[in-house]
């Protein structure tokens, strides 16, 4: 009997694990482990396998929210680091793939059900064209995806670390706030959970008011309750999200559509359709007609990254 393969999607905050029949997408024994509770990746894997009572898998594909091109992988938003070679030897994996988390998000998109996609505005996907997968969580992920002759071909990027480009005087004032705190300001500094909180604090400072909220969830809750500063921060967050995702769609030529993933946006579905996201996405000067026709969806599938790791396991385009 074929042993199940180990599948993982590891972010800065949580590690999600599952088992799957190699070559299939029948996820089972899905668990979410807080990264901070485990000193290392190996400890988390062992804890997961013990919890679900599974035999040691011989195949594994794990996705991480950080660069993964070297043998030594260092997480960007938590303290884990490991050697791919040593982990494969430690667990006896005969097949061990390590991919970027947004490579996994990209590869998961073709396997998402239609009722797990929420359209933002109009647009029609061009067949056979590149897709953009983009979204904020603990950090900001960005990847491309296009159909190859036999398999889906992912284009991993670290596009979340491109420089933030303000589009009006208010954003130039916000940039000055972020520069005072961080020096160089990447778009990830703004388009992530901590970035939403920082945007709120920046709005408070610019308005010469006291910031009352201390977590992104508190800011979102206050915005829903009508707090003007929190509301302005959230609306600006979504407008900048449109700016950056529209720029990324131009860079990749993503006429196949834009898929917004991550832990934040599915919780903002009541805000996104009424925000300036879509206008900012399309507002690209001479390229307005190009971006205006690109469809955008929010992916609500809870385990999209795990589905992508399943796809990657035996996808010959993913090494």
Curated annotation (Swiss-Prot):
It is found in: Cytoplasm. One of its GO terms (cellular component) is cytosol. Its EC number is 2.7.1.2. HAMAP family: Glucokinase. It is an enzyme of class 2 (transferase). InterPro entries: ATPase_NBD (IPR043129), Bacterial_glucokinase (IPR050201), Glucokinase (IPR003836). Keywords: ATP-binding, Cytoplasm, Glycolysis, Kinase, Nucleotide-binding, Transferase. Disulfide bonds: none annotated. Belongs to the bacterial glucokinase family. It catalyses: D-glucose + ATP = D-glucose 6-phosphate + ADP + H(+). The keyword Transferase applies. The keyword Nucleotide-binding applies. GO terms for molecular function: ATP binding; D-glucose binding; glucokinase activity. GO terms for biological process: glycolytic process. This is Glucokinase. ATP binds at residues 8-13. Pfam families: Glucokinase.
């Amino acid at each position: 009997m074929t042993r199940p393969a180990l599948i993982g999607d590891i972010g800065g905050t949580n590690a999600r694990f599952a088992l799957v029949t190699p070559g299939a997408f029948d996820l089972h024994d899905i668990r979410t482990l807080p990264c901070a509770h485990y000193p290392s990746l190996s400890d988390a894997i062992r804890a997961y396998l013990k919890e679900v009572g599974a035999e040691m898998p011989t195949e594994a594909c794990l996705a991480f929210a950080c660069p993964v091109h070297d043998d030594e992988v260092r997480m960007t938003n938590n303290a884990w680091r490991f050697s791919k070679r040593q982990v494969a030897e430690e667990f006896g994996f005969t097949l061990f793939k390590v991919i970027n988390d947004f490579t996994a998000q990209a590869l998961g998109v073709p396997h998402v059900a239609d009722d797990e996609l929420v359209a933002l505005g109009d647009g029609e996907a061009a067949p056979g064209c590149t897709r953009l997968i983009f979204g904020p969580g603990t950090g900001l992920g960005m990847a491309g995806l296009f159909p190859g002759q036999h398999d889906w071909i992912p284009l991993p990027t670290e596009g979340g670390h491109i420089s933030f480009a303000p589009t009006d005087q208010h954003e130039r004032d916000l940039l000055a706030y972020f520069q005072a705190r961080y020096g160089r300001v990447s778009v990830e500094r703004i388009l992530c959970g901590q970035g939403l909180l920082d945007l709120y604090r920046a709005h408070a400072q610019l308005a010469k008011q006291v910031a009352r909220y201390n977590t992104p969830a508190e800011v979102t809750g206050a915005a829903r309750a009508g707090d003007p500063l929190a509301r302005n921060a959230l609306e600006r967050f979504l407008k900048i999200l449109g700016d950056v995702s529209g720029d990324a769609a131009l860079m990749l030529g993503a006429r196949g559509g834009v898929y917004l993933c991550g832990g934040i946006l599915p919780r903002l579905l009541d805000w996104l359709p009424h925000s300036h996201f879509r206008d900012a996405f399309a507002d690209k000067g001479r390229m307005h007609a190009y971006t205006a026709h690109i469809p955008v969806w929010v992916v609500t599938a809870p385990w999209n990254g795990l589905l992508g790791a399943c796809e990657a396991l035996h996808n010959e385009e993913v090494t």
